């Protein structure tokens, strides 16, 4: 296949001026198979020529030139005929006459056997003279073929001394054929010399004490060169946007990064009705799996059957098994570490007070540190519960997919949450947290897996069931706690049900009116550690609006601390919220209609869920629902 040819006629000529010699006119023909890879998009390469260099071993290197100025574009990535990539970088090259070569340091060339060569510039003193093989060129210059010792044996260095005048060199060696010498002459002709001002073609002043020379590193099959290895891991490409300055190893990675500044998202999802766009092809590919349901990355841990859409999600999940927390909080004196950078980013906002996600509901005004908490909060206003359990006879609905995901364990014998101290397993993360506090004195919060692990499968969540909701909103300085809901849902054709949701969002139980009436009018509080606390029932407390203070009574009859009870009347909401605003942790009742529900907050911040009147206790409700669904009564360790 003819990729390049030398021609002395005037048609299609390109000049390569040499120092002290006449300019050569070279006509170079490019095959259509060569393309330019700009990022991930292939485009035809126009106005580009290749110059052939035949090496001593019989292989041919093709040097690429732009027909306009004879040079490549800095940072350009070219994809050659065999599918491999070549990478280009410009740097000045000092030489003895005060000028520099026009060849680019790090310029990539593609060899005939599919290997990639990179052009480098090395001072003469760095060569081992015994490893040099010299050839005399027609114009009087000398070329040296150098097998350098500082590169792997699979590599070969071809060094060209462009201004040498050594005479009497033996060129009859069988390893140096006439075609090689001819190619080296063409290569040496690229030297651009302007002796009048000592300025190179790149505008850089050369150093007189150094000789002009260049070398080609021929990379063998065993150690193929990539842009990263070519630069020895250096990050040479800097983002030029104000305030950024990030560095990258390749021009392509820099270009992808710059899309975060420009907002460019060239990869658009073509799934019907989607229309989402992404900055990278990998992002689009990962997103498309939300439509197909494909999860090719499976956890290899014993007894774990989880799989994920991306390798990054799998890597985050594996840390839940290993306990690895590589992302440390940079705030001095904190010392906490996290499984993902995103959790750490949200955590840092507890130090800075930043809450970038604002609720747009009129009259609300709440703000959140994380997008997840914001989205969950918005559903308080909309009443949306799009995620329904598909187990026959269950039909429970949830505002977020993560709650549905965690709910599924009640239908199995799975206990996915394990203690990193003793190895015990639990169905609920809240029970695991209680175990770690009581058994191991470990109060470190347990980060939930991120929303990427709990994304709904395609098509789920379209059927939204709305109903009246009674919600208490937790106001805690510096931390975001997802609002807890006790939702009363009425569905056409069904009897009224009450869904009881625990503080950590892991227990969701539907109770019929008949079951509620069977429980009676007791008032029971269940603390986070599972201790039931009974409060004496007073008709005045239940029926009247406003805030009341009562003493908690333990199951043994011991009177405990004072708690505030917020009555269920909507008209009392503003009064209750103002009176409780001075407490360290306060709960406010928000309801769309009067329900016999009471919510309390203790002065020391203990999270307590209280069920009043016709509603059962949370503990009893769970037992009733479990008996109905599974025919068994779970214990606390479940």
UniProtKB/Swiss-Prot annotation:
Query: Its GO CC terms?
Result: nucleus
What PROSITE patterns does the entry give? ZINC_FINGER_C2H2_1, ZINC_FINGER_C2H2_2
ZnF (C2H2-type) ranges: 237-261, 267-291, 297-321, 327-351, 357-381, 387-411, 417-440
N-acetylmethionine: modified positions: 1
Q: Quick check: keyword Ubl conjugation in the entry? A: yes
Sequence position, cross-link Glycyl lysine isopeptide (Lys-Gly) (interchain with G-Cter in SUMO2): 213, 406
Q: Where in the cell is it found?
A: Nucleus
Q: GO MF annotations for this entry?
A: DNA-binding transcription activator activity, RNA polymerase II-specific; RNA polymerase II cis-regulatory region sequence-specific DNA binding; zinc ion binding
Extract the SUPFAM superfamilies matched here. Answer: beta-beta-alpha zinc fingers
Q: What is its main location?
A: nucleus
* InterPro entries per UniProt: Znf_C2H2_sf, Znf_C2H2_type
Phosphothreonine modification sites? 352
The record's section on Pfam families has: zf-C2H2
For this UniProt record, give its keywords in alphabetical order, as a comma-separated list.
Acetylation, Activator, DNA-binding, Isopeptide bond, Metal-binding, Nucleus, Phosphoprotein, Repeat, Transcription, Transcription regulation, Ubl conjugation, Zinc, Zinc-finger
Which Gene3D superfamilies does the protein's record reference? Classic Zinc Finger (3.30.160.60)
- Say which family it is in: Belongs to the GLI C2H2-type zinc-finger protein family.
Q: What is the purpose of this protein? A: Transcriptional activator. Activates the gene for selenocysteine tRNA (tRNAsec). Binds to the SPH motif of small nuclear RNA (snRNA) gene promoters. Participates in efficient U6 RNA polymerase III transcription via its interaction with CHD8. In complex with HCFC1 and ZNF143, regulates the expression of several genes, including AP2S1, ESCO2, OPHN1, RBL1, UBXN8 and ZNF32.
- Which PANTHER family does this one have? TRANSCRIPTIONAL REPRESSOR PROTEIN YY (PTHR14003), ZINC FINGER PROTEIN 143 (PTHR14003:SF23)
According to the record's subunit comment, the protein's assembly and interactions are: Interacts with CHD8. Forms a complex with HCFC1 and ZNF143.
What's the protein name? Zinc finger protein 143
